Regions:
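Positively charged n-region of N-terminal signal peptides that target proteins for export
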Residues: 1-5
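A beta-strand edge to alpha-helix "cap/lid" segment located at domain peripheries
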Residues: 7, 22-149
Length: 149
């Protein structure tokens, strides 16, 4: 009986240590993902398709606020479009949820700029799905929904 009790206590102790280590690892990965989200926004404002190319996976799919769906090549081409002139993009209220080697980041955004000579000021929510592959996080899907025009 004593042996069983000791075994259970040791198992509980090591499980708590493993859970704490996992939380620490998740916190570190969460910080990385939040930084990458900010880098993504900076790259969009600077129309830096090369930086964005390094953040998104080869099978990336993007669903815009207006319902347009694009793959990686179209998304990157749109960033380079000279008629696309973003002035600012800010995110807030981000939350990261992990599912083993996948993470979902949700948050709110506000972006201002002009496209084809027309100004825009969008406020919305986004969902980005990131996968850890080849020792790095890459975004494989992004979706935005407009809250206010």
């Amino acid at each position: 009986m004593l042996r069983t009790t000791c075994y259970c206590l040791l198992l509980a102790f090591f499980s708590m240590g493993t859970a704490a280590a996992q939380r620490s690892k998740d916190d570190s990965q969460e910080t990385k993902l939040l930084v990458m989200e900010h880098l993504w926004n900076e790259a969009q404002v600077n129309r830096d398709s090369r930086a964005l190319d390094g953040l998104i996976g080869s099978a990336f799919v993007n669903t815009e606020w207006d319902g347009e769906v694009s793959d990686k090549s179209k998304f990157l081409a749109d960033i380079k479009d000279p008629q696309f002139k973003p002035a600012s993009m800010n995110v807030q209220g981000m939350k990261v949820t992990f599912y083993r080697t996948t993470a979902v980041v949700i948050g709110e955004y506000r972006t201002k700029g002009s496209y084809q000579g027309k100004t825009y000021d969008h406020v919305g929510r986004f969902t980005d799905t990131w996968v850890f592959q080849s020792d790095k996080w890459v975004c494989v899907a992004s979706h935005s929904s407009l809250l206010k025009k």
